[in-house]
Amino acid sequence: MLFTVGFGIPLLVLVQMFMYAMYKLFGWDIRLNLLWLCNHWMSRMGWMSVGHFLLLLVLLTFAGTSWLLSVRMIQTRAAMAKLRSMENHIWSERLNARYEHLRRPRFVVVEQSSPVAFTIGLWRPCIVLSTGLLHMLDPEEEEAVVYHEVHHLWHRDPLKTTLLSVFAAMMPYIPVLKHTSQQYRIVREILADNEAIERTGNAVGIGSALLKLLRACSPSIVESRTQIIQSSFADTSVNVRISRLLDPERDVKLRLPRYAILISATVFLLLSILFVWSIG
């Protein structure tokens, strides 16, 4: 539901912007486009300078979105190249063979003493674990971490979280998108924990692994991973996850940002009023 809202709203806005840009640049006659109606109404009111600003907003939104996505993709490719150079091929092959039954997930085990566990990549995501983490965890904890990350990989969470964060950054006039992006990350981590609990049969493995990773991780390691497209085992909503692991029956209540919802709803309401007024 959160992804549907966070992706559906900006998709609708982008479609409207595309239709409006085609009308302004190439003369497409699209009379049911909300931005065209805004332009038509402003022309009747003599506010064409606002119409030019609206076209500039459309072009900046498309250019900014394309630029941000390109930057994220370049950063991820650079990160993957770095990880491949640090890969311990023996460990990687061992894990790929051990968990081959899980719809063939791709494991990359890097030679690093610090514990690392995350899923990275847009189009071909893979699970990255460090030798330090594998030495630190017992078999039950390792299995729980793997199932957690496999859940992210199956559901392409790095791609989805990236899209939501880019849309939220490029459409600040719809503030509910920022909230949706943040809450989506929390929900996905909780669902990944649930996957691990269901697969292992209890919450001991995932809870113990999370606590070990939090104690061992230094701030520099976490900070160095914030710019690449990944879903990390220990970076998101830690307090909520620990509370729920201690009390699995406890419901997680998502906070509704009333101010952001009000602002976002007002934007759509104003567009609707312009639509009705213009065709009336």
For each predicted feature, which ranges?
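Hydrophobic or amphipathic, alpha-helical segments that drive membrane association/targeting
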Residues: 1-107, 252, 270-280
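Short helix/loop segments within enzyme catalytic domains
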Residues: 85-87, 179-240
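Short gly/ser/thr-rich secondary-structure transition/capping motifs
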Residues: 108-112
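Active-site scaffold of zinc-dependent metalloenzymes
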Residues: 113-139
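Active-site recognition of the HExxH zinc-binding catalytic motif
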Residues: 129, 140-161, 165, 192-193
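Short amphipathic alpha-helical coupling elements at transmembrane boundaries
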Residues: 135, 144-147, 151, 194-198, ...
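Post-HEXXH active-site segment of zinc metalloproteases
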Residues: 156-181, 185
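Cytosolic-facing loops and C-terminal tails of multi-pass membrane proteins
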Residues: 220, 224-280
